Every structure is written in structure tokens, then in C-alpha cells.
């Protein structure tokens, strides 16, 4: 089978950008078993409850659901196991210092294949308060209405 080129997004965490203000993003490799890779290639994963943490100078991804591979045998993986993230030491130290400041967390934003290798985009994020969420929603609606008004004006020939 030929190697895949380019990016193929497997799963995105749409709630993350709604619930958090993402300050920094990083691309990290994932240490996976064979059945996890096969399950991901079928597009089966959920990042909804997922989070990452730094422990002992290593970054870990936890609570990400990758379902068991249907054609797997007794050698299948546990769906919600802890998975190691592959990052440079400087990146891990930078993330760890930010999280230790308080108020910050590490959330997975998307899992994708880049040139045949599974990658996860993680973000260092700060939780949004309820009024921040409402304000962001209001701004989005105002921008959408302004775009509609400009488009209708364009169609009228003004």
C-alpha cells in the first residue's frame, strides 16, 4: 500500500474552542499500538473528555476515546488508555511552566495523520467564563449579520 501524503483529519474537539481560550498550540506525535492506528485510519476517535498533562518530564494524553479495532484479536487496546505524547524537551518545559502558573490546562484540539503518522494538535488553554462565551457568540452573530448585509447590498448593485 502506498504511503499517504498530506493531512487527513480524524477527529476534532469543537467544544475546546468554545469552552477555552487557546493561547498556544503544539503538534505532538502519539505513541500508539497497531490496533489504535487501524481504528484511527477508519476515522474513529473522540476528543470530547480528553486532556493532556505533564508528569516526570513527559507529556501524556488521557481520556481520549479510540474504540477497539473491530477485526482485532485478544491483542486489542484499551479504548481510554493513557497515551504518551512526543514533544521536544523545550516544548514540554514551556507547557509545564504555563500550566503551573495556574488557570491553564492542556486540551487536545484535533487528531490527524500527517504523511502517514498520527499527530495530535494540543493547545495550552484558559477556561472561559459564561459571559465570555456569550460575548463571543454575540460577536460571531454580529459579524455574520454584517456579512449578510454586505452581500445583499452587493446583489442589489449598490
From Swiss-Prot:
One of its GO terms (cellular component) is cytosol. InterPro entries: SmpB, SsrA-bd_prot, SsrA-bd_prot_CS. GO terms for biological process: trans-translation. SUPFAM superfamilies: Small protein B (SmpB). PROSITE patterns: SSRP. It is found in: Cytoplasm. Residues 133-147 have a biased composition (Basic and acidic residues). Keywords: Cytoplasm, RNA-binding. Residues 133-158 are annotated as: Disordered. Belongs to the SmpB family. Required for rescue of stalled ribosomes mediated by trans-translation. Binds to transfer-messenger RNA (tmRNA), required for stable association of tmRNA with ribosomes. tmRNA and SmpB together mimic tRNA shape, replacing the anticodon stem-loop with SmpB. tmRNA is encoded by the ssrA gene; the 2 termini fold to resemble tRNA(Ala) and it encodes a 'tag peptide', a short internal open reading frame. During trans-translation Ala-aminoacylated tmRNA acts like a tRNA, entering the A-site of stalled ribosomes, displacing the stalled mRNA. HAMAP family: SmpB. This is SsrA-binding protein. It comes from Leifsonia xyli subsp. xyli (strain CTCB07). The lineage of its organism: Bacteria, Bacillati, Actinomycetota, Actinomycetes, Micrococcales. The gene is smpB.
